[in-house]
Amino acid sequence: MVLPASMRLRGSRCFEHLQKWGYRFYGTSMVLRVIEANPQLLKAPHRHHNSTACRCAVVISSKVSKRAVIRNRLRRLLHDHLRSRLEVAPEHCNHWVLISLKPVASAIEASPLLEECDRLLNQAGLLS
């Protein structure tokens, strides 16, 4: 299942800001970047719509897999996991999260991948 629109991170300015200034947490198969939300970087229609909520994005390059089916499967898996984890997060969670998968991620089973995602979210302080 995909992330609801209120939880999606959109816009190149948001991604550039996260890439440049976000705190990085490294795992064996992914990199998690976190930064405090900055609603001014959102495009106008999305700026006031739940601007204090956690917003997430998952980036999977073609280096992970040349097959779009595999990349989309991994993206849906992580979207569903992030949605279930961050919906129960505290209301004061006002961070933006970007997950970038490394090329080794396509060879890893789903459960170790999700465990690593949880571990990185815990390191970032987004899960209690």
UniProtKB/Swiss-Prot annotation:
Record's catalysed reaction(s): Endonucleolytic cleavage of RNA, removing 5'-extranucleotides from tRNA precursor
Pfam families per the UniProt record, alphabetical: Ribonuclease_P (PF00825)
EC number: 3.1.26.5
Keyword Nuclease: yes
rRNA-binding is among the record's keywords: no
InterPro entries, per database record: Ribosomal_Su5_D2-typ_SF (IPR020568), Ribsml_uS5_D2-typ_fold_subgr (IPR014721), RNase_P (IPR000100)
Sorted UniProt keywords: Endonuclease, Hydrolase, Nuclease, RNA-binding, tRNA processing
GO terms under biological process: tRNA 5'-leader removal
Any GO molecular function: tRNA binding
Superkingdom assignment: Bacteria
HAMAP family linked: RNase_P (MF_00227)
Family: Belongs to the RnpA family.
Protein task: RNaseP catalyzes the removal of the 5'-leader sequence from pre-tRNA to produce the mature 5'-terminus. It can also cleave other RNA substrates such as 4.5S RNA. The protein component plays an auxiliary but essential role in vivo by binding to the 5'-leader sequence and broadening the substrate specificity of the ribozyme.
Assembly information from the UniProt record: Consists of a catalytic RNA component (M1 or rnpB) and a protein subunit.
Protein name as it appears in the record: Ribonuclease P protein component
Species the sequence originates in: Prochlorococcus marinus (strain MIT 9313)
